[in-house]
A protein has these predicted regions:
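Terminal amphipathic alpha-helical/low-complexity segments used for targeting or macromolecular assembly
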Residues: 1-64, 171-183
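Structural signal for interior beta-strand "rungs" in well-ordered beta-sheet cores
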Residues: 61-164, 168-169
Length: 183
């Protein structure tokens, strides 16, 4: 029996593979040494079954790193680097996203939540606010404030964020290397 299916499905496995490849260590060290991985692990368990939601409810609040993770749909392969003071509250986060510290992904009200595509890298201190859609393969620069939609393959920086470059997979082949595919 596959332990990942029992505990949280393919998304948990994709998260583990992503962390393992970037941190170069096994599950025990990831779980004990990296609170971001541990918190994400608990999130996946809560997502997987109502029993886990009840058992892990006390762990939902009071995280020492102030990592708040709340989304209706987070695909596998999410990597949170230094989750200190990071708030993630959105409709969707695509596969293989990378979020750095002090990032805020939030809503202007309960119905206007961000949608984050696949292979998005959100650098330290960036803010993604309101009913915005971030396309696939986007890089959001450090301390950028995104309040408008960002098309796929873009790099955005500044306050408010503006596109400084539109890339292609031909000019940036590394994106296909870091993507993780899990059945």
């Amino acid at each position: 029996m596959n332990i990942f299916k029992l505990l949280g499905g393919g998304k948990l496995k994709a998260d583990y593979i992503r962390y393992k490849s970037l941190r170069r260590c096994g599950f025990a060290k990831l779980f004990l040494a990296y609170p971001e991985f541990r918190y994400q692990f608990y999130y996946r368990l809560r997502e997987h079954s109502n029993l886990w939601k009840i058992l892990l409810k006390p762990l939902q609040l009071g995280n020492s790193h102030n990592l708040y993770l709340n989304s209706d749909d987070i695909e596998g392969g999410l990597f949170i680097e230094h989750g200190f003071s990071t708030i993630i509250a959105c409709r969707h986060i695509g596969a293989n996203c990378w979020i750095n510290q002090q990032v805020t992904i939030g809503y202007s009200d309960a119905t206007n939540c961000p949608y984050i595509g696949n292979n998005v890298h959100i650098k330290a201190g960036a803010k993604v606010i309101g009913n915005v859609r971030i396309g696939d393969d986007v890089i959001i620069g450090a301390n950028a404030v995104v309040v408008n939609d960002v098309p796929s393959h873009s790099i955005v920086v500044g306050v408010p964020a503006r596109i400084i470059k539109v890339r292609s997979h031909i000019s940036d082949p590394w994106r296909s290397i870091v993507s993780i595919q899990v059945e």
